[in-house]
């Protein structure tokens, strides 16, 4: 069984095709940029991820076929806690708010009294890295986007 592993990173996406014993058959990488805005805001254009994914898939399938191999499964790993609001057609409504973005500091500070409860539920404290505060920020600061959001 050959598995194509897709890793969606902060500055690039990689696709590595492994054969059943773990040997690397092919490796592809596509680079993209984050946008660093005022006040420690960090965003990325979701279209960059989509374009990188299609490029890696196309190249990986072609190389596998050239080697007489096939792709039996795909596994995806991704940077955590980045948030993209999408509409009912799964189209992005804004850039992704990245995991290292700090725009939600004020939300997290206002919730410090909940740290013990949050920790008991999920093993983590209220922190701007995590996605919940980013969703709250969109609800509070970009209500026009939040109103159109089907999922994050």
Which stretches of residues belong to each language-model region?
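Glycine-rich phosphate-binding/catalytic subdomain of phosphoryl-transfer
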Residues: 58-152
């Amino acid at each position: 069984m050959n598995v194509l592993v897709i890793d969606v990173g902060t500055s690039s996406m990689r696709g590595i095709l492994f054969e059943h014993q773990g040997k690397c058959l092919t490796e592809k990488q596509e680079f993209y940029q984050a946008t660093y805005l005022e006040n420690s805001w960090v965003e990325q254009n979701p279209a960059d991820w989509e374009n990188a994914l299609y490029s890696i898939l196309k190249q990986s399938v072609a190389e596998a076929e050239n080697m007489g191999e096939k792709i039996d499964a795909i596994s995806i790993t991704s940077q955590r806690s980045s948030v993209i609001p999408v509409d009912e057609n799964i189209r992005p409504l804004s850039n992704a708010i990245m995991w290292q973005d700090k725009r939600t500091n004020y939300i997290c500070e206002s919730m410090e009294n909940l740290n013990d409860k949050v920790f008991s539920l999920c093993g983590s404290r209220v922190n701007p890295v995590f996605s919940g505060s980013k969703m709250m920020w969109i609800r509070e600061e970009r209500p026009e986007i939040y109103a159109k959001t089907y999922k994050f």
